[in-house]
From Swiss-Prot:
The gene is lexA. Keywords: Autocatalytic cleavage, DNA damage, DNA repair, DNA replication, DNA-binding, Hydrolase, Repressor, SOS response, Transcription, Transcription regulation. The record marks 85-86 as: Cleavage. SUPFAM superfamilies: LexA/Signal peptidase, Winged helix' DNA-binding domain. InterPro entries: LexA, LexA-like, LexA/Signal_pep-like_sf, LexA_DNA-bd_dom, LexA_repressor, Peptidase_S24_LexA, Peptidase_S24_S26A/B/C, WH-like_DNA-bd_sf. It comes from the Bacteria. This is LexA repressor. Homodimer. Its EC number is 3.4.21.88. Gene3D superfamilies: Umud Fragment, subunit A, Winged helix-like DNA-binding domain superfamily/Winged helix DNA-binding domain.
Length: 202
């Protein structure tokens, strides 16, 4: 099977969740709402692509005419390496490859992997070259390690919320805390770090 695109994986995950939670697949309109697109035409095109790749079967003239096939195994988590300034994280251009990870490895499910650049989170056990397992989220609790976009740059820091301010704290005394007033500058949380994979030792 050819690797799924980010959008196709998102749609496949949406179908799986509906089948697992509701007992039946979603409609095209429900998929469009779930992935944040306004046009059902684009969803239909992606569903046809998923059918060609052998992961679903489309049943004509049925509002919920989608059937998951046995080959619809997890394509793996997208691995994002160097992040281009100003670009959304989960675009096909940002994905290096897909990696298979057993769901039992981490307490919380990850949505993508992010390659660490730099040593600002060293004392939290995160070093240059590590792969972070990240769960997509737009909100986070104080104390969680988050992936955030600030000034079109993506960084990994521990979030501390205090009053109206948000502080992005490194885990290395050689780096400075970043104070953010969300009313003056946008702070976009991209996800919460739920695991770390060390890619080399020594």
């Amino acid at each position: 099977m050819k690797p799924l695109t980010v959008r196709q994986r998102e749609i496949l995950d949406c179908i799986r969740r509906s089948v697992e939670n509701e007992g039946f697949p979603p409609t095209i309109a429900e998929i469009a709402r779930a992935i944040g697109v306004s046009s059902p035409h684009g969803v239909r095109e992606q569903l046809r692509a998923l059918e060609r790749k052998g992961v679903i079967e489309l049943i004509p003239s049925a509002s919920r005419g989608i059937r998951l096939l046995a080959r619809a195994e997890e394509p793996g988590l997208p691995l994002i390496g160097k992040v281009a300034a100003g670009r959304p994280l989960l675009t096909e251009a940002q994905v290096e490859r897909y990696c298979q990870l057993g769901p039992e490895l981490f307490e919380h499910k990850g949505d993508y992997l992010l390659r660490v650049q730099g040593m600002s989170m060293r004392d939290a056990g995160i070093i240059d070259g590590d792969l972070l397992v990240v769960q997509q989220a737009q909100e986070a609790r104080s104390g969680q390690i988050v992936v955030v976009r600030l000034h079109d740059e993506v960084t990994v820091k521990r979030l501390r919320l205090e009053g109206a301010l948000a502080y992005l704290e490194p885990a290395n005394p050689e780096f400075s805390v970043i104070a953010v007033d969300p009313e003056r500058q946008p702070l976009c949380i991209e996800g919460i770090v739920v695991g770390v994979i060390r890619t080399r030792v020594g």
